[in-house]
Amino acid sequence: MGIFDWKHWIVILIVVVLVFGTKKLKGLGSDVGESIKGFRKAMNDDDKPAEQPAPQPQQAQAAPQGSPLNQPHTIDAQAHKVDEPIRKDQV
């Protein structure tokens, strides 16, 4: 005999049926079932490989030797001080 015995579950079930009604519970059950089916379908679709793999794009032309594409770079600029507005309640 744990905290929730089978008798407790029956009482909870009766209270839920009285509060929500059978129509809402049927609708909720069908919505949950459809959600589970959709989830399973999506999971199965992810497992299957694509039927026709997309053709791989041709490689772009190599960058010239002096190009800094892969080199780290620094932006030289100065920060400007921002004037914060004065709060009226502090004056």
From Swiss-Prot:
Residues 42-91 are annotated as: Disordered. Residues 78-91 have a biased composition (Basic and acidic residues). Keywords: Cell inner membrane, Cell membrane, Membrane, Protein transport, Translocation, Transmembrane, Transmembrane helix, Transport. One of its GO terms (molecular function) is protein transmembrane transporter activity. Residues 51-65 have a biased composition (Low complexity). InterPro entries: TatA/B/E (IPR003369), TatA/E (IPR006312). The chain crosses the membrane at residues 1-21. One of its GO terms (biological process) is protein transport by the Tat complex. It is found in: Cell inner membrane. Part of the twin-arginine translocation (Tat) system that transports large folded proteins containing a characteristic twin-arginine motif in their signal peptide across membranes. TatA could form the protein-conducting channel of the Tat system. This is Sec-independent protein translocase protein TatA. It comes from Pseudomonas savastanoi pv. phaseolicola (strain 1448A / Race 6).
